[in-house]
């Protein structure tokens, strides 16, 4: 017992020492989700990260994974301490990777959110969403990363779940890619239909309008909350303050405004919390509820239990708003 107490006291002492010296952190890794090729993401984000290094006195290293899960897992194992996510991937980071939302994108035009799209080539025979819903086996489909809000969760719920369809079986073939990959696949007629979002289309309108001219938007989602920035909860409070002060104060001069404009046409960032994820959590739960309701292979008792569990979670989220 005495040995156990000594071991515990020793561990607590080490922990206290670690916390006491935590403000001496010299480097942090900032995870960037893979909405486009790593080279393009570096070009957009590195000027911002370099300015963060100068302002905070902490070296900020960009971490560019090939998929969303790579950033989530890196944050889980403390290989990444700060990250940009979509709302759906931020939920995974908060629930599994010690994450906590601390800031949110603000659009250049003041829009409080963005939109998910279904797109096709302008030469395509697909003219309406009804054609997509009624004749899926005639078409190939490009969906987003599994952890993408606008590339997967939102279109899956609003286009397919509400119409009692599963995109995995509805189409002749389905492939998964990031937003850039899906846009280019439609542009090059490699898939008939794909998910996209207003961030990607606005970028294309500005940088390659001739490419955007080849694209037809078939469906537009309800407004999606703008993306969050997430840090690990266990970062020291003084480091958190340095980071948040820099982030929410960024964009005051012309140089910073230009950097933000190149980052998906941003005006800056505002302080935020995990509460911004509630609408997306509700969306995921509604999607699961409808899936269970329509599952003919599930027993009535199991179905009732699962639906009751979802309803309890939805009620708790409604109170948390």
Predicted feature residues:
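Hydrophobic h-region of N-terminal signal peptides that target proteins for export
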Residues: 13-21
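Bilobed "Venus flytrap"/periplasmic-binding protein-like clamshell domains
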Residues: 25-53, 65, 88, 111-184, ...
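Periplasmic-binding protein-like
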Residues: 29, 33-34, 107-117, 209-244, ...
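An extracytoplasmic/periplasmic, membrane-proximal ligand-sensing/linker region
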Residues: 36-37, 43-47, 239-321
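Extracytoplasmic/secreted proteins, especially bacterial periplasmic and envelope-associated proteins
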Residues: 40-47, 51, 70, 74, ...
């Amino acid at each position: 017992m005495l040995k156990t107490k000594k071991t515990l006291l020793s561990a607590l002492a080490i922990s206290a020492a670690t916390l006491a010296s935590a403000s001496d952190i010299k480097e942090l890794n900032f995870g960037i989700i893979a909405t486009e090729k790593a080279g393009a993401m570096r070009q957009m984000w590195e000027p911002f990260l370099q300015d963060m290094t100068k302002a905070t006195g902490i070296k900020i290293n960009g971490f560019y994974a090939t998929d969303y899960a790579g950033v989530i897992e890196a944050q889980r194992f403390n290989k990444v301490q700060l990250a940009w996510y979509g709302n759906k991937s931020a939920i995974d980071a908060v629930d599994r990777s010690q994450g906590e939302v601390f800031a949110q994108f603000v659009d250049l035009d003041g829009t409080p959110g963005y939109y998910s799209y279904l797109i096709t080539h302008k030469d395509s025979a697909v003219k309406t969403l009804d054609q997509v819903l009624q004749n899926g086996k005639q078409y190939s489909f490009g969906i987003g990363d599994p952890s993408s809000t606008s590339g997967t969760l939102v279109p899956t719920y609003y286009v397919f779940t509400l119409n009692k369809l599963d995109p995995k079986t509805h189409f002749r073939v389905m492939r998964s890619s990031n937003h850039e990959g899906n846009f280019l696949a439609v542009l090059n007629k490699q898939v008939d239909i794909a998910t996209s979002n207003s961030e990607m289309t606005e970028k294309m309108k500005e940088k390659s309008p001739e490419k955007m001219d080849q694209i037809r938007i078939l469906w537009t989602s309800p407004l999606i909350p703008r993306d969050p920035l997430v840090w690990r909860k266990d970062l020291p409070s003084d480091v958190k303050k340095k980071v948040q002060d820099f982030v929410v104060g960024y964009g005051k001069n012309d140089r910073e405004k230009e950097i933000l404009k190149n980052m998906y046409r941003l005006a800056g960032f505002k302080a935020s919390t995990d509460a911004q994820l509630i609408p997306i959590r509700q969306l995921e739960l509604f999607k699961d509820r409808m899936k269970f309701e329509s599952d003919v292979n599930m027993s009535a008792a199991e179905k009732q239990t699962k639906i009751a569990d979802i309803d309890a979670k939805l009620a708790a989220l409604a109170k948390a708003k």
